[in-house]
Amino acid sequence: MKRKETYLSRDFRETAALRFPAQAKELNTAFDMRLSALLAENADASKEKQYHLKRQILPGIAAYETLQRVMPKEEALQTVHGYVEHLARTSHKQLAALLHIPGLYRLVPGVFVKSTRSVFGPAAGFAPKELQTGNGVWRVDMMKCPYHDICTEYGCPELCRCFCDSD
């Protein structure tokens, strides 16, 4: 069964094709092999954690490691950071456009809290600490984060900031 292409794998392939055309096929193969190995090593993770692993964490690690074959480590980090930042900007624009629909903005706080608790909860490997601040303000400190844990486990803790910066 073919894996669903993520934005990270799509952007990686675009970088390989545009910047390293002579090596693109080799880079894509290396990326695919590394991603397959990472997915196999993490196959026993919960369904909730798999959402983060498959969509962002593991493709990010595979792209970062593979890019280091053809560019310096810092450039590879900035390249992956650019992929994540581009998605964040696009998502922000889409949300901003939706909020122009009359009355929709009133629903956002409730939906945001509910979805955050679901997607970023303990089952996904997070340990959120909710801080009650009052006056309609909701704060969450993440005491444990699978993005940090997995990136550190695979020897690339610096990659975590790519994901954190997009929040």
Sequence positions of predicted segments:
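Beta-strand-enriched cores of mature, soluble protein domains
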Residues: 45, 49-53, 58-61, 85, ...
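Amphipathic interaction/junction segments at domain boundaries or subunit interfaces
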Residues: 67-156
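Low-complexity, glycine/alanine/valine/leucine- and proline-rich hydrophobic stretches
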Residues: 156-167
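Helix N-terminus capping/helix-initiation residues
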Residues: 17-21, 72, 145, 167
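Acidic-enriched, low-complexity/disordered segments with a strong bias for Aspartate over Glutamate
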Residues: 11, 32, 44, 141, ...
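N-terminal, charged low-complexity regulatory/assembly segments
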Residues: 1-67
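Generic hydrophobic secondary-structure signal
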Residues: 22, 40, 140-142, 163
